[in-house]
Amino acid sequence: MIRVGIIGATGYTGLELVRLLKNHPEAKITYLSSRTYAGKKLEEVFPSTLENSILSEFDPEKVSKNCDVLFTALPAGASYDLVRELKGVKIIDLGADFRFDDPGVYREWYGKELSGYENIKRVYGLPELHREEIKNAQVVGNPGCYPTSVILALAPALKRNLVDPETILVDAKSGVSGAGRKEKVDYLFSEVNESLRPYNVAKHRHVPEMEQELEKISGKKVNVVFTPHLVPMTRGILSTIYVKTDKSLEEIHEAYLEFYRNEPFVHVLPMGIYPSTKWCYGSNHVFIGMQMEERTNTLILMSAIDNLVKGASGQAVQNMNIMFGLDETKGLEFTPIYP
């Protein structure tokens, strides 16, 4: 059994980790941490978890003694210093602290200096692209939700040099859970219900993460213009991506089928079928569709994921499976909830 700890167990991604790991045949939750609810049983605060473990303040000695792997489900900037205190424990960070190759990029977009970053061996945890590196990783930076949906949608086209990477336009829409459990007027029911609005236009922190990984795939400079929108639903991300090409839709579609042929969670839809967030609700599955706007030679890619599962906690469990030599679908085999 893999002994598992979770820091930030009472946020949305932390609670999703609890749900997934309680049903994992090879994992046992041995440590749960929450500053807000320290001293309480998790099921006292969230009865749906059916988990009677007592929440505690972060204690690096207890983590090192009781855990083989630690999931850190904390806001950006909160995990880095905690992780540096730990020895002999594998780390999967669901925040942004270990996603970037260049600490200067993190400093520019997140406003924090990561002292000693270059001494930490870390891997960007997108299994479909970095599976071999993840196998031997000690620290994994779990990808962001928007980058997961965008990178997986673009990877085959960029890898095969089928599109122009110079300007990639991304219009993405996310459910409110993507904002976390923080108290903010913008996320009150009356503010969100029956409303659709863009946010962080031209300055979203996920842009450099997308560009970093897409440039690795293409070997060329990539420019992403990204506009996210908040929609009145709980879960899900739908990303619509516009990119120039001189290839046919049939050639591109065939390349996608080949690229993802052996991937258990990525599904390339038949031409003319477009994804819905309802199809991946509560699951680790990704659905990708495409169409060609022939007047302008524009390829339109569409991807749907559950932001809390493949966009966060499910992908983290997938990474854990790979790190410990398990079938990466362990604990994630379930189909989406529908309707």
Swiss-Prot record:
Q: What is its EC number?
A: 1.2.1.38
Which coarse location class describes where this protein primarily resides?
A: cytoplasm
Q: Which Pfam families match?
A: Semialdhyde_dh, Semialdhyde_dhC_1
**Disulfide pattern:** none
Q: Which residues form the active site?
A: C145
Task: Fetch the SMART domains from UniProt.
Answer: Semialdhyde_dh
Biological pathway: Amino-acid biosynthesis; L-arginine biosynthesis; N(2)-acetyl-L-ornithine from L-glutamate: step 3/4
Note whether Amino-acid biosynthesis occurs among the keywords.
Answer: yes
Q: Which family does it belong to?
A: Belongs to the NAGSA dehydrogenase family. Type 1 subfamily.
What is the official name of this protein in its record? N-acetyl-gamma-glutamyl-phosphate reductase
Provenance organism: Thermotoga petrophila (strain ATCC BAA-488 / DSM 13995 / JCM 10881 / RKU-1)
What are the top taxonomic ranks of the organism? Answer: Bacteria, Thermotogati, Thermotogota, Thermotogae, Thermotogales
What gene is it encoded by?
Answer: argC
